[in-house]
Amino acid sequence: MRYGFTTGSCAAAASKAAAYMLLTGKKKETISIVTPKGIVFETKLLDITRKEKSVSCAVEKDGGDDPDITTGALVYAEVSYTERSKTFHTETSLQTETKALHATIEIDGGIGVGRVTRPGMDQPVGNAAINHVPRQMIEAEVLEVCRMADYKGALKVIISIPKGVELAEKTFNPR
């Protein structure tokens, strides 16, 4: 059986790649991360866009031999320089490390990423519906790049799945 990778893994890989290209100015064609299960995920980067203060790129979701509705969708990450927010709180286990590094990573959802609408979910009402494990993965990968580039400022990561709006209409939770 051929393994696929989660949407969260795709988001983390795209985030790492966009952060790398932003902080180093170098282009990447592929990127690899290690998933929480210890599996190396190497993937090709698509639709790379550079702006003055941000870089975005996409990773194509591959569901392997057990595909779901998101298989084939492009998962985008845009990483940009931002000001530190006094109200921002990542809610991850990496908070202590983040403070020690003096780097701040803010994670939000863009087009095609739902918002939490009811209490009791993994994230507070109003937040992007990106659960804590993918958030931890994204933060860890971006922090790794920050350490490598000796960057101690603030970065904002926006995860988008343009096809997500269309895909959500085919599920039990179209919001």
Model-derived regions, located:
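Generic N-terminal targeting/processing segments that precede catalytic cores or assembly contacts
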Residues: M1-R175
